[in-house]
Amino acid sequence: RRTPEGAGADLARIMRHYLAAWGGKDFSLIGFSLGADALPPMIANLPPDLRRTVRQVVLLAPSRNVELEFHVSDWIHDDEAAQDIALLPEVRRIQPVPLLCVHGRDEKSSLCTELSPQEATIRSLPGSHHFDGDYAGVAALILEHLRRP
């Protein structure tokens, strides 16, 4: 079982590699589904110097909770386990990083519906977890968000 601290250390190692390899200075972090669920606790556990390099975060179809361990059975049923991490407090830990949260209107459980407009830019798209296949529309939302200063 992964811990938020261990996952944050993994993300830190990847970020340091790409800062050196590409000579960049900041990151926009984007996650879909389980990736969107895992990002907030990972970012919250980054060292302060790397936290300052996170310019924007985009969460696509996030749940309300995450277990940092994948099981194939999770695709069949999505039961909340006692060891699940609630994402709302984790998102609040990474504030004031600009956050875009995108969810499908037909999704039954989404972190996006728990966030206030002060905490995130929230976009609701037609469909469920895969946004009725409108990936061009999702990409346009992401690009619009990333263009913001």
Regions found by a protein language model. Name each.
Residues R1-E5, S28, S128-F131:
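Second-shell loop/turn segments in exported
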Residues R2-W22, P41:
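Alpha/beta-hydrolase active-site loop
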Residues S28, Q56-V58, L100:
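A structural signal for isolated positions on well-ordered beta-strands in alpha/beta enzyme cores
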Residues I30-L39:
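Gly/Ala-rich beta-loop-alpha elbow adjacent to hydrolase catalytic centers
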Residues A38-M42, L68:
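Hydrolases whose catalytic domains are alpha/beta-hydrolase-1, hotdog thioesterase
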Residues L50-N65:
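A conserved short beta-strand
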Residues P62-E119:
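The feature captures the conserved acid-bearing segment of alpha/beta-hydrolase catalytic domains
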Residues E114-L115, E119-P149:
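C-terminal catalytic histidine-bearing segment of alpha/beta-hydrolase fold enzymes
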